Amino acid sequence: QQNLSLGWKHTTNGNSGINADFIEIGDFLLDVDPESKREGDQSTLYNYSLSIDQDLNHPRGDNIQYFFSYGADRFNTYSQFDIQSNVFSTRRNFHLDENYFSFFNLEDPVFSPNINLLRVVLNREEILRSGRISLDYSGQLDDGSSMLFSYYRDEKTFKSGGQKNGRINGISFGQSYVWPGSQALYGYKIILENYRANAGFEFYENYGIEFSYSQPLKENWQFSSKYSYQDKSHDEDYPLFGDRHDQMETLRFNLLKPIGACWSLNFGWVLTGTHSTINIYKRSGSNLSAQVNYQCFK
């Protein structure tokens, strides 16, 4: 399946501006330049994705899923923040005859190794390459909920410098439930991970939690929402700035409406906020977007 989308976005922080009035360096306080504070902007969104499902003709229904996407976000004013990304992933699904983990009482367990490659370009210059391997174990529990347990390792290479290059090791656990009688779906996910870089002050531990809710509405509209919170503590003091501890919150709302067999409309609203003990990392903003999608390519 192929999907092509074109959209528009308004953001209150198009220049990735600082949400603070001063910066503390040692015992000194420096005023933040007004041009470094957040400013609004509009951008155009482009996205193409291709997904392929290879049936392995296995009695249990094993398959391989391939996915590729290209996305671009081009700003009207702050073009230095134009961003492009490429994603390629491969996922192999093994439908198991029995549950191999007794502490999960699962029905229809599935084991899924996954490889995900990411490339990010900022203003026509590559800034990041990432290679992630994950091992997922999923199925249905006795209470009717769906469960997903995942271990992952993510190798990151930043073009800006070798000190930040490193790897994430993490685990996540989540469940989703169907609300009786309403077709609503709700769930949660817990994340525990650490990052080990070439410089000790880039080491951190991250703890996160997500809550999600989705529900079909009248006239074929589909509503979905997600709240996520992350708490990230660095192991060592940052040079000049001292202790770094970040708390990040994101709230997403989305409305999707199919139009016929080939077209769909997508409206999104995202609120973000980052609180940090170092003022230059404080950020906040909101994005409002609208996209048109087409998916009937031959």
Which residues are covered by each model-predicted region?
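Gram-negative and organellar
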Residues: Q1-K298
